[in-house]
């Protein structure tokens, strides 16, 4: 048993010795491989240098053989030109972007202006439709087309009485028609209300029957004639003291005529005898 174990021990020792030699050989080969790697790198650098020298030699030969080559200075200028051209291209690209942005802003502004114009046009159309609305138009027509038939301070009864008296005088004596200035003056005098002349002295009405007898009947009864006489007596009052009453505008030429006609020719005179009677009353 012991002999067998010793034999096996000897075999293992021989294996160990062989392995140690193998490891020593591998370590030696490692160092050799490193040196081989270094030599390969050096040879690679030499090959690259040689290839660059060959390429430069070939390029120089081509330049020498090229008849269009103008020298190194021209090559430098050409290189600068290419760089400047590249810079211009970059600037043109930036300018194009800026112009595109400005064009978009302009289109946006035009679109907003069109929208504002359309909105304004719609507002104007709505205003026109409101102005043409039948609920609003009658009131405006009434306000614009209304013309007063007489001044606001003139009573309706006075204007009607003036018309009736003028028509009576015209039918009784067509030759006794007054001029437009005198009729305008009489209408102005009749436009003054009785309250404005209340402070003026009144004329006694003792001689009024003679005036009534001078006015033709023309189908009027005694009550109508008395009302006309009372109204004519109120019209004979001098309108000298008039206060706080707006007067009717009168042309300057007709103003002078009115004053002379009122003093010389009383209204509704039909003959000289009546004129003398009216003068006596005054």
UniProtKB/Swiss-Prot annotation:
Entries under PANTHER family matching the protein: DASH COMPLEX SUBUNIT DUO1 (PTHR28216:SF1)
Spans annotated as Disordered: 118-282
Family membership noted in the UniProt record: Belongs to the DASH complex DUO1 family.
InterPro entries assigned to the protein according to its UniProt record, in alphabetical order: DASH_Duo1
Entry keyword annotation includes Nucleus: yes
GO cellular component term of the entry, any: DASH complex
UniProt KW ATP-binding keyword: no
This protein's UniProt keywords: Cell cycle, Cell division, Centromere, Chromosome, Chromosome partition, Coiled coil, Cytoplasm, Cytoskeleton, Kinetochore, Microtubule, Mitosis, Nucleus
Subcellular location: Nucleus; Cytoplasm, Cytoskeleton, Spindle; Chromosome, Centromere, Kinetochore; Cytoplasm, Cytoskeleton
Disulfide bond entries: none
Protein name: DASH complex subunit duo1
Annotated Polar residues bias: 169-189, 207-232, 265-274
Function statement: Component of the DASH complex that connects microtubules with kinetochores and couples microtubule depolymerisation to chromosome movement; it is involved in retrieving kinetochores to the spindle poles before their re-orientation on the spindle in early mitosis and allows microtubule depolymerization to pull chromosomes apart and resist detachment during anaphase.
GO biological process, one term: spindle attachment to meiosis I kinetochore
Highest taxon in the source lineage: Eukaryota
Quaternary structure and interacting proteins, as annotated: Component of the DASH complex consisting of ask1, dad1, dad2, dad3, dad4, dam1, duo1, dad5, spc19 and spc34, with a stoichiometry of one copy of each subunit per complex. Multiple DASH complexes oligomerize to form a ring that encircles spindle microtubules and organizes the rod-like NDC80 complexes of the outer kinetochore. DASH complex oligomerization strengthens microtubule attachments. On cytoplasmic microtubules, DASH complexes appear to form patches instead of rings.
Coiled-coil parts of chain: 75-130
Biased composition (Low complexity): 118-128, 144-168, 195-206, 233-264
Disruption phenotype: Sensitive to thiabendazole and osmotic stress.
